[in-house]
């Protein structure tokens, strides 16, 4: 072994020498050509500061300190005006793109399941003028069907171009749009449609057949269903009195002269634009009421943090458009002339589950420059790439590590490593098309480990944001020059953020070295409250003496000296154990989620017990290999139910917990392995892959009793 190391040291000596020479020759011209000094100064500067010396005062961005921004494009104070501005400016430029489905094949998997595989063609684009024509026709058609201004219309549909066309129609014709996640279960969909009293519903044939058909008898108000696909359905299978139309037929109706001649009833800034139903991570979905002015303000803040946003950019849309992050990102891209190519998590990359082997995924074909991702997706990319690295031979692995560590060191200094990008990371970067210049992360905290990996291997900054549905997605976003990790950036120019003492959790604005407390966001981007839920609105929202709205987030934050915010806890995730210790379940999960053997984890604790337990979705490939090494045989379910495999997972949990310096009482001491992954379709996680703790608790109730010594 010693001889091997000595030989390796000799072999790698030229590599280290090359890096030293490269650094000496390239650094000085690169430093001046890329304006690295200015970028470093930008990264280190104060980005936000409190409005007064009083503890608990709101923090504001230093670039918009005297007043908060409420509008981006002069005169465009409603969403329809943003749309008109974009159409007038970018008329014949490509706008919305969809890939052609060339063929579909059923493929038998080793476990006996049949997966549908797709062979897809190139993207087909419609330009801004064509989008405008479809919006006008669809709006006139809905009006001809009897939909009145300020009457709600719901959309329960997958992310696609028709979703955006329908949304822009509703904004222009002043139809408040009720949005529902396509993965919601029957009970949640029925609740949202009945509570909103929507009489018109936009959906897809697949969702109509698989989810809505069985729920129609429980839905009170829906009289018209519009499906977006170019397919046919058997109307005889649906209740009498329910009118079903294709989107194409509604557009054709609207194009008739007697209908198209009627101008739309335009909205005002104080009109309702959206009632956005949440994913229900903490219970029944709530409808969040957003006025046009709320969304305009929020997007004003978000766009300011994306430098150079414009017609040269291509955005890949695959996250749920019912999620505020995706919706505001796409509207912003449309406004600034960026192409939007539509995708899905199942077709995103060449390795995605619906892409036939040998075919190209959407990123490879589209080559986006901008994309948004939730941490769960970035964690998967990180684990997949690092798994490939582990399969390399010793020299390849060592070379990768040298290059990775070298670039990481440069990034921490605010520099880059172009040679490493070209030689080492080009193939990794190609997984997302090769052209991504910035990624937006939101929906949950991104682990520092994954954040650093994305910076290094994908050669682009990560704009880590913090916002909520209730704040129209706007709160904070890290600047592209800020390469620190574990933080979510300074307040956007549209809002201010203050911290409020939470005595029970031990967080106060007087804490040293930095103030800590519950995060409260204020500004015009704060939504108007919860639909038909005045009690919850009064609990979470407030209005100050100046008429400004504030929202209490329930998240715990810490402000750093440069004005950047760090999310450190969540009130609802805190459990007091029997002996009096407080455990933050989210903190435990974040510390353990990047374990190679773990794909997902949920920590659980009860106040009448003295220890933490966990539910884990193991990595099937790695755990199966480990089972073979340990002589454990059987199916995947058998492996997950094997006590020896549970012990191996617990061993890895302990090692990771110690490395992350978790307290003894925070470390799970029992585990239940789940052979089935947690997906939005199972109802155990949201579309942003946040854990649904209540549903997980109910799902594993018997296991909880067993692990806590019950029957």
UniProtKB/Swiss-Prot annotation:
Q: Where in the cell is it found?
A: Mitochondrion outer membrane; Peroxisome membrane; Microsome membrane; Endoplasmic reticulum membrane
**Molecular function per GO:** arachidonate-CoA ligase activity; ATP binding; long-chain fatty acid-CoA ligase activity; very long-chain fatty acid-CoA ligase activity
One biological process GO term for this chain?
Answer: long-chain fatty acid metabolic process
**What EC number(s) does this enzyme carry?**
6.2.1.3, 6.2.1.15
Q: Give residue spans on the Cytoplasmic membrane side.
A: 29-711
The known regulators of its activity are described as: Both triacsin C and rosiglitazone inhibit arachidonoyl-CoA ligase activity.
Query: Per its Swiss-Prot or TrEMBL entry, what cofactor is needed?
Result: Mg(2+)
Cite the InterPro entries for this sequence: AMP-bd_C_sf (IPR045851), AMP-binding_CS (IPR020845), AMP-dep_synth/lig_dom (IPR000873), ANL_N_sf (IPR042099)
Q: What induces it?
A: Expression is decreased by polyunsaturated fatty acid (PUFA).
GO cellular component, as recorded: cytoplasm; endoplasmic reticulum; endoplasmic reticulum membrane; lipid droplet; mitochondria-associated endoplasmic reticulum membrane contact site; mitochondrial membrane; mitochondrial outer membrane; mitochondrion
Q: Does the keyword Ion transport apply?
A: no
Where would you find the membrane-spanning parts of this chain?
A: 8-28
Tell me what topology the record assigns in the membrane: Single-pass type III membrane protein
Q: Name one Pfam family in it.
A: AMP-binding
Keyword Secreted recorded? no
Q: Which reaction does it catalyse?
A: a long-chain fatty acid + ATP + CoA = a long-chain fatty acyl-CoA + AMP + diphosphate; (5Z,8Z,11Z,14Z)-eicosatetraenoate + ATP + CoA = (5Z,8Z,11Z,14Z)-eicosatetraenoyl-CoA + AMP + diphosphate; 15-hydroxy-(5Z,8Z,11Z,13E)-eicosatetraenoate + ATP + CoA = 15-hydroxy-(5Z,8Z,11Z,13E)-eicosatetraenoyl-CoA + AMP + diphosphate; 12-hydroxy-(5Z,8Z,10E,14Z)-eicosatetraenoate + ATP + CoA = 12-hydroxy-(5Z,8Z,10E,14Z)-eicosatetraenoyl-CoA + AMP + diphosphate
Residues that the record marks as modified (Phosphoserine) are: 447
Key words of the record: ATP-binding, Cell membrane, Endoplasmic reticulum, Fatty acid metabolism, Ligase, Lipid metabolism, Magnesium, Membrane, Microsome, Mitochondrion, Mitochondrion outer membrane, Nucleotide-binding, Peroxisome, Phosphoprotein, Transmembrane, Transmembrane helix
The entry's function note states:
Catalyzes the conversion of long-chain fatty acids to their active form acyl-CoA for both synthesis of cellular lipids, and degradation via beta-oxidation. Preferentially activates arachidonate and eicosapentaenoate as substrates. Preferentially activates 8,9-EET > 14,15-EET > 5,6-EET > 11,12-EET. Modulates glucose-stimulated insulin secretion by regulating the levels of unesterified EETs. Modulates prostaglandin E2 secretion.
Reproduce the miscellaneous comment text. Answer: 5 rat isozymes encoded by different genes have been described. ACSL6 corresponds to isozyme 2 (ACS2).
Question: According to its UniProt record, which protein family does this protein belong to?
Answer: Belongs to the ATP-dependent AMP-binding enzyme family.
User: What PANTHER family does the annotation carry?
Assistant: LONG-CHAIN-FATTY-ACID--COA LIGASE (PTHR43272), LONG-CHAIN-FATTY-ACID--COA LIGASE 4 (PTHR43272:SF22)
| Stated name of the protein | Long-chain-fatty-acid--CoA ligase 4
- Source species of the chain: Rattus norvegicus (Rat)
């Amino acid at each position: 072994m010693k001889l091997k190391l000595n030989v390796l040291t000799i072999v790698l000596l030229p590599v280290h020498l090359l890096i030293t020479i490269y650094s000496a020759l390239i650094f000085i011209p690169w430093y001046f050509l890329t304006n690295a000094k200015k970028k470093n100064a930008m990264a280190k500067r104060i980005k936000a500061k409190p409005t007064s010396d009083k503890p608990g005062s709101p923090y504001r961005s230093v670039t918009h300190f005297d007043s908060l921004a409420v509008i981006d494009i002069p005169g465009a104070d409603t969403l329809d005006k943003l749309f008109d501005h974009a159409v007038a400016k970018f008329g014949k430029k490509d706008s919305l793109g969809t890939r052609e489905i060339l063929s579909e094949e059923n493929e038998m998997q080793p476990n006996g399941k049949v997966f549908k595989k797709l062979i897809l063609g190139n993207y087909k684009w419609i330009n801004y003028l064509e989008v405008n024509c479809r919006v006008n026709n669809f709006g006139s058609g809905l009006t001809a069907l009897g939909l009145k201004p300020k009457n709600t219309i719901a959309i329960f549909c997958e992310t696609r171009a028709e979703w955006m066309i329908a949304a822009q129609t509703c904004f222009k014709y002043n139809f408040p749009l009720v949005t529902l996640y396509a993965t919601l279960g029957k009970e949640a969909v029925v609740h949202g449609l009945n509570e909103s009293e929507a009489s018109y519903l936009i959906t897809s044939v697949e969702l109509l057949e698989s989810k809505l058909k069985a729920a129609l008898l429980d839905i009170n108000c829906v009289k018209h269903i519009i499906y977006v696909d170019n397919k046919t359905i058997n109307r005889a299978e649906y209740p009498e009195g329910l009118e079903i139309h294709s989107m194409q037929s509604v557009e054709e109706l609207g194009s008739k002269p007697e209908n198209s001649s009627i101008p739309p009833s335009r909205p005002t800034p104080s009109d309702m634009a959206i009632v956005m139903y949440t994913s229900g991570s903490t219970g029944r979905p709530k409808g969040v009421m957003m006025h046009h002015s709320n969304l305009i303000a929020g997007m004003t803040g978000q766009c300011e943090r994306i430098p150079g946003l414009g017609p040269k950019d291509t955005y890949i849309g695959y996250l749920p458009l019912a999620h505020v992050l995706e919706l505001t990102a796409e509207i912003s891209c449309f406004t600034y002339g960026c192409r939007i190519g539509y995708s899905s998590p199942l077709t995103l990359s060449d390795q995605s589950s619906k892409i036939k082997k040998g075919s190209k995924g959407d990123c490879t074909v589209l080559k986006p420059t901008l994309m948004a991702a939730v941490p769960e997706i970035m964690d998967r990319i990180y684990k997949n790439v690092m798994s490939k690295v582990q399969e390399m031979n010793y020299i390849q692995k060592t070379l990768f590590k040298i290059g990775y560590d070298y670039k990481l060191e440069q990034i921490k200094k605010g520099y880059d490593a172009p040679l490493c990008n070209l030689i080492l990371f080009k193939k990794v970067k190609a997984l997302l098309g090769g052209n991504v210049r910035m990624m937006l992360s939101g929906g949950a905290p991104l682990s520092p480990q994954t954040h650093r990996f994305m910076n290094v291997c994908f050669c682009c900054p990560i704009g880590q944001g913090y916002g909520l549905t209730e704040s129209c997605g706007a709160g904070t976003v890290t600047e592209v020059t800020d390469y620190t990790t574990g933080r979510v950036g300074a307040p956007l120019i549209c809002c201010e953020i203050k911290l409020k003492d939470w005595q029970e959790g031990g967080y106060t604005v007087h804490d040293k070295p930095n103030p800590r407390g519950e995060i409260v966001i204020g500004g015009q981007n704060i939504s108007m409250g919860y639909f038909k839920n005045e009690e919850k609105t009064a609990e979470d929202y407030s209005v100050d003496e100046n008429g400004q709205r504030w929202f209490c987030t329930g998240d715990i934050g810490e402000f750093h000296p440069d004005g950047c915010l760090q999310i450190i806890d969540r009130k609802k995730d805190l459990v007091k154990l029997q002996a009096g210790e407080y455990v933050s379940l989210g903190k435990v999960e974040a510390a353990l989620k990047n374990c190679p053997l773990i794909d997902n984890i949920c920590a659980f604790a009860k106040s009448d017990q003295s220890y933490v337990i966990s539910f884990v979705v193991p990595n099937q490939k790695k755990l199966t290999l480990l089972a073979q090494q340990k002589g454990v045989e059987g199916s995947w379910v058998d492996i997950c139910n094997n006590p020896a495999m549970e012990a191996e997972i617990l061993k890895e949990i302990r090692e990771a917990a110690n490395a992350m310096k978790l307290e003894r009482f925070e470390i799970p001491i029992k585990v239940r392995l789940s052979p089935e992954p947690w997906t939005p379709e199972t109802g155990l996680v949201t579309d942003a892959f946040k854990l649904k703790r209540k549903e997980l608790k109910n799902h594993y109730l018997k296991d909880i009793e067993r692990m806590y010594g019950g029957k």
